Amino acid sequence: MAAKWEKKEGNQGELTFEIGADKISEGIDKAFQRTKKNLNVPGFRKGKVPRQIFNQMYGEEALYQDALNIVLPEAYEEAIKETEIEPVDQPQIDVDSMEKGKPWVLKAVVTVKPEVKLGQYKELSVTRQNTRVYAKDVDAELESRREKQAELVLKEDQPAAKGDTVVIDFKGFVDGEPFEGGESENYSLELGSNSFIPGFEDQLVGVKAGDETEVKVTFPKDYQAEDLQDKEATFKVTVHEVKTKELPELDDEFAKDVDEDVDTLEELKAKIKDELKEQKESAAHDAIEDEALNQAVDNAEIQAIPDAMKEDDIHRQMDQYLANMQQQGIDPKTYYKLTGTTEDDLHKQFAADAERRVKTNLVLEAVVEAENIKPSQDEIAAEVKDLASQYNMEESAVRGALTDDMLSHDIAIRQAVDLIADSAKQNAKAEDKKDDSDKN
């Protein structure tokens, strides 16, 4: 089949291709078989009219449009392969000629992937983050674990302070009327947690068990319930209990309580230091990767990104995000209700960086091509095994869902990222070079 690609302005071009006699005949045969099922012709049972009679009555041309619809998808795909173009959107296809006894000629306006001209992407200069673990880092983590092990004990006839927890009943009113969601009983609220309406917690500092009080607040302008935005409200509050945190002693017993693999506080400190070191090194690697990748993208020349590519990216991000929520037992409807957002809000959230994500992927694909990165069958097999383990699937199910080309593409992209990051020249911050502080 003859196919010709002519690049036009921007990311568009014209794809001219033919559908040959054999395919046309095949399409007409299938179109006739579909058409005759519902055809009533005098002298013949329904659906039994011969082809010759049909042609005499209606002409073979009456089947052309249906035949075209049948053979066009395959013909278009073959034309794409022949011309080696990469469409990113649905084409606009028009019939150029459809004459009996001749190949059908079609012209398609096609939007293709933007061209990428790579700049420097290897040996880029990046900043290495400080990965030292200091005594203060270990102390902060120990304090965090103490907070998690804290017990709430009743404060007898003592006023509530910030950091204390009050157990309250409350009922809210706007313009003298109660509102939906504004009432609760035996609600535990940590003062200073900023988990309630701004100003609410501050007005409970100083209350005691048994107190009844009123709290006056103004709902934020961006409050999730639109009917309450910027509204003044009064809450009637009854205080049942005031509790304060009692932190455990920082000793060997505490260490054994928070980590069954250690016997002493010193062992816990050493383990925390190792964990923090691993976290910092992982974060530093990610930062180098991000900085190097951003430079590689900035150094490249990339044609304008088609809207279709940005939309595809946005919907992929949304699907992945909602799938992750689903794995946590939160379906999309529940997610939107809990967050007070809509599908449009989520779309806008991912739209903000869609163009950058698409550009990054285009640059990585260009690096894969420039470096001739081709994952081996062993690497593909290992990827299948990892995915099967990650998603608790059979390897055969992974193979059924993903082709080798798809798996190879994902592996190659990751290898391109590694190449860019690993070749980068890492420079320590000036203050890190001078820093001779306690490394614990």
Swiss-Prot record:
One of its GO terms (cellular component) is cytoplasm. InterPro entries: PPIase_dom_sf, PPIase_FKBP_dom, Trig_fac, Trigger_fac_C, Trigger_fac_C_sf, Trigger_fac_ribosome-bd_bac, Trigger_fac_ribosome-bd_sf, Trigger_fact/SurA_dom_sf. It is found in: Cytoplasm. GO terms for molecular function: peptidyl-prolyl cis-trans isomerase activity; protein folding chaperone; ribosome binding. Its EC number is 5.2.1.8. Keywords: Cell cycle, Cell division, Chaperone, Cytoplasm, Isomerase, Rotamase. One of its GO terms (biological process) is cell division. SUPFAM superfamilies: FKBP-like, Triger factor/SurA peptide-binding domain-like, Trigger factor ribosome-binding domain. Belongs to the FKBP-type PPIase family. Tig subfamily. Involved in protein export. Acts as a chaperone by maintaining the newly synthesized protein in an open conformation. Functions as a peptidyl-prolyl cis-trans isomerase. This is Trigger factor. The gene is tig.
